[in-house]
Amino acid sequence: MLSRRHFLTSLLTPAIVALAPNLISAQEGVFLDEEEAPRAVFPEGTHFEKKVVPSTEALREKMRGLLGRTRPSIWEDAYVTYLVRRHGERLGFAVIAEEIGKHRPITFVVGIKPNGKVKDVALMVYREAYGGEVRERRFMRQYHDKDLAAPLLPYRDIVNIAGATLSVQSIGRGVKKALVLAQLVLLDGAGRP
Amino acid sequence: MKRLLTLFVVLSVGLTAVGTALGATLDDLERQLQAIQKQIQELKEEKQRQDQKIREMEAAQAAQKEEVKKEAASLREQARRVSSELAERVRIGGYGSVRFEGNSLKEQSNTFTFRRFVLTADAKPADPMQVYMELEFERFTQLELERTTRPQDGGLRVAQAIEGTDGSEISFEQLWFQYDLYPWLKFRTGQVLVPLGRFNINHDDNRWNIARRSLVDRGVPVLPVKSAWPELGAGFLGDIRLGELGKLTYEAYVINGVALDAEVENIAQTRDPRRDKLELEVEFQPSRGTAKLDMKDSKAVATRLAWSPYPGQEIAGSFYYGRYTPQFLSDESIVAFAIDGLTTIGPFEIEAEYVNTHFRNVDRVARSFARVVVDQSANIPSSVSPTFEAEVEFELAGLARNKHGYWIEGRYRFWPEFLTSTVFGKYFENPQLIAIVRGEQVWLNGLVREAEFEGGVLTKLEQENRRLYRVTAGLAYRPTPLVVFQLAYEYTKTDKGRSLAEVTNFLPAQSDEDEAHAILVGVAFGF
């Protein structure tokens, strides 16, 4: 009896240790720095032109108007944005945004196409102890091609992650904020960057 | 002529005298004037000196004020940094829940229940390390100990009184240290939640929409110990990404594990016409393992492996194996396994869990127990004490050859737009109403009903098969993800003519009450 238990115990640990390291992910952490962020959402981009948009009270007021029922938990002092080109062709904008999860801010980058739709979203910094699954590509893929008309809410148009509902809701808020900023400041009237 | 000359002389002398006198006065005046001017100059200089001094003093005061201001600002910054660092390293949270219940039972038809308040703390001693704690106060209102020691009646009198309320419990639901050895391998040790099924590891009340926990996990525990079930041990956990195939999540621990442990109950009873009674009942039942010296020379293993092909979809298998008998009884083990899952399709969710627990050789354990205890009970015969009876009794409880059961819960989330402008919607970003239906069944096969023994020999072991099912339907309102208002109707039924109290740990049914209807209203919150 004892030896069987010992056998089972000793079997489990090495089996787990033997798993390939690059297959496994962590919760908290810094996953992208500011320089890497636009490349994460526009990997095909060749030129990244940084532009800092000050977050003035007038801009916030306009953003509030477009955000409707979505109420940001953070108003950034300024928005770090990148105009992304591939050999001269304009691909879109990358906007760095922040929103509070349960206790702490989540920082992420939103890639926005010239038509005002989401190209991609990538997590830059996750500071919560739980809910780090929002970092996964398969979760972030849900935001592809979403625009301002989308609710971006769990159980509406975004599949929730059990135990991370607040983080899921935060990412949705942040994506909306980035889309609104693009609409007001980055894209021209014809919807071109 | 002479008179004219005389007049001239007199006038000259007079004028000379006057002139001399006048000249002397002007000199004096000039001197005085100079003296005054000098004094004025000195006063001016003195004033300038004083002004300079004042200016210097004012400048010094201003500099001093600036210095104080700077120091205060620096102190404030320091305090802010310290508190921010502390906030970064330690996060306090928690959850709590209360319930009102009205039911059809004869004995107790309605009650408020303080389900629990759990305080959580999450700290990071260093970047790859984490300490997590959940301290639970369940059905808790107070616990007070009074003790007096004093000489009395020619001897020493020590009196002790424990004051508390029924069911009050303080417990560490979790208390562990985690070291992320590599980003892909996390080592955890301490009081960890046993990963058998999905409820135990996701047991926070504010995550669920019905104000009563499931039968297999709590009310008729098929889990070896009712949830929340932590054990002291160590192990590993992590997530394994499989690319397009999704994600695997694993947890694997070696723990002290469940053991038959004694619960000592004191009963004082007045009876008429029988003798009044003072009873000491020692009940041995499967209990959470000790945090001190393990009472068995054997550890248990528990592991869970979950596969999530897509977000919102998960299926998992879990397993528990370990000795459940203390060292002084024959060596017998528990084998338990669970299958659980979650699927999400838009606003619909289905979540389910099946648990199967097998206590090996319950009859052998009963015989072994009889051998060790020798006599099931001992009391003072009425011939010795005609009005008062004292008894000590040993019992085996909570054992069954096999227990198994499941719960399956369907949820539909919606929000009528007309509520958006009301108080239920206008303050919240994503309020939800959730319609819930939960179905549950439990089978208890070979449930030990009575074990009688005398002189170290088991004389009777009565076992029975019992079945119980429950259906719950309700509506929950979630203004935010952390807060839920719960309303549900619940119907519970066991074998015809048999009491629900015999198989559940939450329904005070009488011996003929085999069914119960209940309305549950609850609030659960997290922060």
Which residues fall in each region the model found?
Chain B
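Bacterial N-terminal signal peptides
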Residues: 8-17
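Outer membrane beta-barrel
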Residues: 79-260, 266-267, 297-302, 306-315, ...
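Surface-exposed loop/turn segments flanking beta-strands in extracellular/periplasmic regions
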Residues: 208-218, 271-280, 374-376
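Outer-membrane beta-barrel pore domains
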Residues: 103-107, 154, 161-165, 176-179, ...
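N-terminal periplasmic/intermembrane-space "pro-region" immediately following the signal or transit peptide
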Residues: 22-103, 391, 420-423, 453, ...
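Loop-centered beta-sheet repeat module
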Residues: 269-326
